[in-house]
Amino acid sequence: MIARIWSGESPLWRLLLPLSWLYGLVSGAIRLSYKLGFKRAWRAPVPVVVVGNLTAGGNGKTPVVIWLVEKLQQRGVRVGVVSRGYGGKAAAYPLLLTPETTTAEAGDEPVLIYQRTGAPVAVAPERAAAVKAILAAHNVQIIITDDGLQHYRLARDIEIVVIDGVRRFGNGWWLPAGPMRERASRLKTVDAAIVNGGVARVGEIPMQLAPGLAVNLRTGARCDVAQLSNIVAMAGIGHPPRFFATLEACGAHPQKCVPLADHQTLAPADVQALVGEGQTLVMTEKDAVKCRAFAEDNWWFLPVDARLSGEQPDKLLEHITSLVR
């Protein structure tokens, strides 16, 4: 229903316009208060790169964060990552991740980024506190904030927006009548716009999510996902249909697709109930970090990597690297 409202297919979005105007007024006032100096943002002693969205819902932001961290690490840059930690609840904040940190404490995306990159990761509702925690414990040269484009209390040096190339901005309205956190005109002020799928427009960086080999949660064994049989697909991400379409494109044809809410807590019994005798469960890597502790032998995940094309990605990386002292 939400997807139909935000796309403009359902006329119900008109009923939500008063709330959208209120949302737009408040969010615009917050941004303007920082722009005019009525409120002061905290500036870290190292450069800060924000990777965020203009819309609610999954746009492929986390793969971009992982891509950026890995590319900077390859250039010898010491990177730290901060996040709000959606879906997690720590005993105290800021929380600096360790190998023992669970998704229940930190949220699924921070744990995934930590496991994939090995970079220091900290979570806190106040992102400045997370930055300070990393700087106190690690000699990092740059901070990447996973989401937080609208978190103006943290000053930033680079802003990167990730756009779903198929859905783009839906009906163009602010939440809740539409998907927008800010108006599309905000793109004029960011340093880079990365478009996940669809067709990138002039000045935008095209990106595709490239699937790898399926990985068994219990053993770590790898295989072509198309070789798995009787698949039940599970996706607890911002836009589950994208994952199901990826499986189809890989030659894997699920018998059943189970969309879940983004950051949804997964209980062992609930996940186990999805799979019948002789079936194979295939999930996203973000779901896998929540399920690994109670995984069954026939549970697999399909990792994806961001693939950015054209000359702009290298120019963006050069620009970011030039900020490092």
UniProtKB/Swiss-Prot annotation:
Belongs to the LpxK family. Coiled coil: none annotated. The keyword Heme does not apply. It comes from the Bacteria. It catalyses: a lipid A disaccharide + ATP = a lipid IVA + ADP + H(+). ATP binds at residues 55-62. This is Tetraacyldisaccharide 4'-kinase. It comes from Salmonella choleraesuis (strain SC-B67). NCBIfam families: lpxK (TIGR00682). The gene is lpxK. It is an enzyme of class 2 (transferase).
